[in-house]
Amino acid sequence: EMPKGGKQSLDMMYRTCGIQINYDYTSESNFEKIFRLGNYLTPLTIALYSNSPFESGKPTRYYSYRNKVWQNTARGGIMPIAFEKMTFEKYFDHIIEYPILFAIRNKYVEPNGQSFKDFILGNFSNLKDEANLKDFETHLATIFTEVRLKQYIEVRSLDACDWQCLCDGPAFFTGLFYNALDEAFEIIMKWKKENVMNAYLESPQKGLNTELEGKKL
């Protein structure tokens, strides 16, 4: 499933290292703002926290080769629903359309391309058991988007780095999500989806020279 969905999926699994930061939310409306803000700011996150210019010990033309790899990965990227009015139900409906990577029943059981929705409906050809909450938690953990929801919101676009940089990322997003959320959300709601997506695709190579809404990051 992974290599079929993205040509660098296995590189992502075995050859990259990033920082993942978890944030709590207080309500569905609070979740929506944090989730969407995190997604809209992905180009800036990549540019600020780029730290992977090498591949196999050789320089590349990227500030963040890791993010270039992740952009060619199955089940990754920016979720299209991040540009829409968000609810828990909409997130759930979107997530269950992803193909299942595996289910665990004392061993790993692989599907034949079925989605988690198929699993819920009893159409998992290699398994007759009903889907349960643990299966859904496993499925959530196999979604590799730039921002994802589990029991918390996870921001995932930062390259791994040393301790000083490692502390900066959580502090940056804590300030935005918990102290300037409404103001930041108001700003990003003026941005066009296509401009955010273009900046997202360009940011691993252009870094802070990436343009978004007519301005360099």
Question: Language-model features: where?
Answer:
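Acidic, His- and aromatic-enriched active-site or binding-groove loops in soluble protein domains
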Residues: E1-M12
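Short, functionally important structural connectors and interaction interfaces within domains
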Residues: K4-G5, C17, F136-H139
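Short coil/turn linker and secondary-structure boundary residues
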Residues: K4-G5, T26, W191
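C-terminal accessory/tail domains of diverse enzymes
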Residues: M12, S29-R36, Y40, L44-L217
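Short, conserved phosphate-binding/catalytic loop or strand-edge motifs used
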Residues: M13-I19
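Short hydrophobic/aromatic beta-strand micro-patches
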Residues: N22-D24
